[in-house]
Swiss-Prot record:
Name of the featured protein: tRNA pseudouridine synthase B
UniProt function note: Responsible for synthesis of pseudouridine from uracil-55 in the psi GC loop of transfer RNAs.
Molecular function (Gene Ontology), one example: tRNA pseudouridine(55) synthase activity
Protein source organism: Chromobacterium violaceum (strain ATCC 12472 / DSM 30191 / JCM 1249 / CCUG 213 / NBRC 12614 / NCIMB 9131 / NCTC 9757 / MK)
Domain of life: Bacteria
Reactions performed catalytically: uridine(55) in tRNA = pseudouridine(55) in tRNA
Active-site positions on this chain: D48
An example Gene Ontology biological process: mRNA pseudouridine synthesis
EC number: 5.4.99.25
Amino acid sequence: MSKPRSNRRHIDGVLLIDKPYDISSNNALQKARWLLNAAKAGHTGVLDPLATGLLPVCLGEATKFSSYLLDADKGYRATVRFGVVTTTGDVEGEVVSERPVEFGREQLEAALARFRGEISQVPPMYSALKHQGKPLYEYARAGIEVPREARQVTIRKLELLSFDGVSAEIDVLCTKGTYIRTLGCDIGEALGCGAHLTALRRTATGGFSLDESHRLADLESLDMPAREALLMPADVLVMHFPQLELADEEIGKFLHGQPVRFEQKCEKMQRFRVYQQSSRRFVGLGEARGDGRLHPIRLLANQAQA
């Protein structure tokens, strides 16, 4: 699937992928990169191989702003199987215990209520978190349990969509760093029977939704111009910052890394999406630091050369 590096193009933008089941996020990214023959690509948050759903892929200069999506809230739809605990917290693991499921919808709703808001989570052993330079899952596969510190995360939304007496489908909106596998397992323990995930689908990240994404198989059927037409501009990653336009005489200085005069009242350390006034083109991010100047902090290289 690889193409010679010399033939890859400098192309900028964001492509929303619907990651399929049983491939890694990196494999999905590399496939998208290959389909667009892009020189540079990066994603904005890893999905487990068994998880599906929204995976924003940043190409070219858009990779400079990918961290803003890493920090964004995420939405998921998950299926939780109660009464069965596995080593990994999902269907890939070996069964370690089975207990009867002896609760109804009312008790389940009450348990879910306890997990809304700020909660404490212990990261799972089967995760990419590192300990002494190695991911935790390598220790787990070797049968080694590594102590992990609990971390605070926020569950902004936790809604029960369906329950058949054994499995429940839940809709979750959470802050970064939340492990949905751990959430499902913890809900099961709170109900006295344990649980694991049988399905997980990311439905949202930042301001993007799964409805806007594209399947890799569909992209393969398109020609290159049609694929390029699906790219979103880099500034979609930073739309949560206020917009600011600079006059042409200031934009040159700004694009060469020099701070420019800024007299607008705002909070100290406020960041702005910066555009050239005449062309309306996005050039990068600037930061007001309370010194009467706007400092460039992240610029599009292709705009600096324009």
